[in-house]
Amino acid sequence: MALVTSLITLAIFFMVAAPKDAFALRRAAHHHRILHHLGVLWNPLFRPSHDSLLRQNEEINRLDLPRIQDDVELEALKDSGALVPIEESESLKVEHGLDPSRRYCRPWTRDFLQDLSEVYYRQFHDQIQVNSAVRTVKVQKKLRRHNRNAAPADGDTASSHLAGVTVDLQRRGLTKEEIRFVEHYLFYLNALGLVEPEEERRHWCFHVMVSDRYSDWRQTQTIFPQSPTQEPVAAPVPAVAATAASN
């Protein structure tokens, strides 16, 4: 309870403390590229990038996690407890079209989902929705045939969904306030090296890879940063990779 209350305070703090024009520098750096989808401004804090995919895979390599090849490997990881089920609750729901066999993730990723969904629910009285979780290489290859923008199924930029550390959270339909709330929540965790997020435009979702350090960190409840002088103008790029390099 103390952790959830503190996380709510933290997210609200970042929202209130930041000036409205803080994204100006970041917009200029991207040559004022303003995109719209159904009339909604697309200007995410965490843009997908090659470097982000590299960082996600570096973290998976640090953890020595396998890229799950097929359903046989997937079921074995479930049986061993290495993958745990994502269960719906008052604060969390799962997209109805997501195959029940893939409603699984690593234990620390589920911890992250539980905390974020409870914080979000207390603030907005609505649920966070999980659109995607663990995938197999077989599934990822099939996805690539239908979506050329999907991450590869192998190599240094392979999809982090293949290791079960990543979830996609619904972004479509959220208000500006709700999006800003989630972005600032992720910004702080990213700065601590606990998550590596991206905001995907094609599927309008928050793609979030979670480090195993999250479970240990959440037990400390030492989550209050120094007061920011302005809203973040760009995501703290080297977060996960820098932390991994120190181990």
Question: Language-model segments: what does each one mean?
Answer:
Residues V16-R27, P152-N247:
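Catalytic cores and adjacent binding grooves of peptidoglycan-active enzymes
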Residues L116-F124, N147, G173, L186, ...:
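Sec/Tat-exported extracytoplasmic proteins
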Residues D126-L143:
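Acidic helix-start/capping segments at beta-turn-to-alpha-helix junctions
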Residues P100-S101, Q114-V119, A153-G155:
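Short secondary-structure capping micro-motifs at structural edges
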Residues K141-D156:
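Active-site-adjacent loop/helix surface patches within enzyme catalytic domains
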Residues C105-F112, L116, V139, E178-Y185:
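Stable alpha-helical elements in mature extracytoplasmic
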Residues A2, T9-F112, E200-H203, M209-P236:
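Extracytoplasmic cell-surface/polysaccharide-interacting catalytic and binding patches
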